[in-house]
Amino acid sequence: MSLLGSISLTSGRTLAVVAVLAVLSLLAGAFLLPRWTPRHFPRRTRHWLGRAVLILVPILLVTATGALILNRSLGLVKTSGDLAALIASNVDEPAAESGGEVTISDQPIASSSLDATFTRTEDGMLTTTWTGPISGITLPVFVIAPRDYSPTDGKTYAVIELLHGYPGEADGTTQGAHVQEALDNAIDAGIIPPTIIVVPSLSVDEEAHDCADIEDRPAVYTWSAHEIPAFVRHNFPNTSDKRDAWMLGGFSAGAYCAVWTAMRTPQTFGAAASLSGYDTQIEGQMTNLGDQYLADNTLSTMLAKRVPDGLRIYAMAAADDGAGGAPAAVKMAKAVKFPDTVTTDIPPTGGHAGPLWREHIPTMLAWWCSSDKVANALGSSPTAATARASEAYASIVPATNVTHTVRPTAPNGLVSLAVLALLSAAFVTLTWRFAGTWSAVLAGDADASASRSRFFRLPMPRVIAELPRPVASCVTYAARLACLSVVALACAAFIGVCANMAGGFYTSWSSVAESFMEGLR
């Protein structure tokens, strides 16, 4: 990977460098604005170009700073190379229909091929880079174990496998969702029995990841449904091999894959959790297998057609999720046949973002063990009563119908967009036409007459002109700096709202603020 392509977009150092550059661009811009006068640059083209640079550079750097902060909250894009690949994948021509889904027969896995050596990350997760013996996929795998875990502690552990979304990565998603904290708290409170969480990477290339084994593509289904469970049982031998002690969950695109995979692999998974998932796949190569394939692999259709075997599904999505997560949950609940069950959890707000998932990880854990199926599979003490009495379980908002609405003043609302557009236009105009005149000049100075030219309309106010020159210089510099700062912040917010409306992530300003605080940690 080239040097430019290897720049980390999640490190505090990168954020600090860009933030410092943004501040310096504001300071320099405020200093140079009055020096871009017609006297210095009488030709209009040079004057306009210089003034545009002084305004655009701070806007771009402040926007980049905000984007880096939000990206750090979930680690969605790791490096500049990943960002370039993500952009390229979204502008390329749509792929043609591929050869279709393939079935890889069960193959014996040699015990030695399951061996792994783990290291511990800064936040306490165990990690290794491992190669699936059947799929050939080589990717990082992260394991979150309880704080007192030991393979010789005499306990039998349940297992939760979590699948990240796209864009995104295993470690960033789990760190941003505070999964380790939620796991330890739930175990300490007796809400769930001892449990290990495994989070495999699904990023086999720069494309959106798949759920299925597709011809001429890496065998992601084999990796997540067969190899990862075998990997866990081998390296953590005190984990249960019983279906009811295993749950497969996911976020966004990973949520669709979690429910899809759990239905395809009933011998392994007795429960599934969908956090802001879809009913029909909208990403990856599965979308190129034809309309009939997509219809057959719609989750509500699969639930209606499958032979029910007691699969339990937790389907959470905010009612204002623009990606359709809430309608997907309701459709699954209406299609399910007993003894399969679907529990819907539809909070009124939350969008399709990290703060919502962070809030509902404890809810997912409480729901999972609100049935004693898990405890019975482990032979441990019952948890259902404790789980059902918990605040997390009480927060579930069941729904049978949902209506998607967008608040006009939300980060994805038209009023917010219009206000920021007007604010940006007003302050860009103010900075472009007037801020350059806010400087302390002596009577008869050539700049004084130039400041009254077509492009610099306002002379220095009398109240400032009467101040001592050093004080007046500081006051006018502060005014230019404030004006340019407002321009940069307003335009950055406008760009952010446009991107948010396209992506459908945030639906409340509080969730934006929460992600900012998370990204600054």
Q: What residue ranges belong to the model's regions?
A:
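Non-catalytic cap/lid and distal C-terminal segments of serine-dependent acyl enzymes
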Residues: 1-448, 452-521
